[in-house]
Each structure stands twice: as C-alpha cells, then as structure tokens.
Amino acid sequence: MSDRTEAFQIDSLNVYNGGVIGLAHCPGRCGLDAQGHLWRRSMDKDVATIHNWGAAAVVSLVTLSELNHLGAGSLSSALSARNIVWYHCPINDGQAPDFRFEAMWSKIETKLLRLLCEQRRVLLHCAAGLGRTGTVAARLLIASGVPAPQALARVRAVRPGTVETAVQERYLLALCDA
C-alpha cells in the first residue's frame, strides 16, 4: 500500500477488568515514511476516532521534532478541544526509554494506571505504533502486575510487530529485576 488514508486503527489491550490500552500510529500523520508510504491523515478525523473510541488520555511517545515532522504539531490542541488529556513522554525511535522519559513517566504513570483501574481508556502512540508504543504498553501491563514475558506476549498478540528492538525487549525484562 502506498497511500495511508484508511480509517485510523486503534488496537485495544484489556487491563484491570475493563480498562483499555490503545495502541496506534501517530494521529494526523502526513508525508513519506522510510518505506516510501505516503501518509495523508486528517487530524480532525483521527482525533474524532480517538474521541469516539473513548480515550480519556493520549500519550505521545515521539519527540517534539518528530511530531512536527510527521505533520502532527497540532495534536495537543486537537485533543484538548475534545477534552482528552495529552501527555508527551518522548523516546528516541528504536530505543528504550531513557532517564528523561523516566523523569516524565514518574509524574504520569500513577495517573494512567488509575484511569485504567477506573475502566477508562488510554491511547499510546509513536510514529508507526510499534516499537515505542508496544514498549510502553507492556510497561503499563507490568506495572499492573503482569510478568514481563506475558506482557510482551499480550501486546504482540493485539499488535503484531510491537517492541521492535532487542534493546526495548531487554528494557522490559529488566523492569522485573529492578
């Protein structure tokens, strides 16, 4: 496929008997990706889909420069207009979370887990919705008490190809040793 204009896809991962973690690519994404696919997303349509899915919060895992490069610099204001809370916790593409992510994450993890416990929905996204998105989805499962190997398997079952790199997988497995 060379033109990415189809409906915005959110893969859903159940947690806490009713909470849902959503995994997706970057809403409103435009331009060519590394594989030569042309993305022509509508920010308004994608955010409407996120709203209709029932997201209480969205966590962007791309850097600010990536967000702008992807044509999604207006995401925070589009979400705010729909009363959806936006968090920005960037991770470098292909990498595991670093100390900057950990500092930001420590301020929001409890809020996200509380939303999930309240049977609410939290959407995670990076550029393609695979590496960083899958890593953080698995991290939320681990924080909810799921052992790392099972968390990885559950995330990969709902969104194949997630947690793309060995460094991301090692990061998750090390969380259980910490």
Residue map of PLM features:
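Cys-dependent protein tyrosine phosphatase-like superfamily
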Residues: 1-123, 128, 136-178
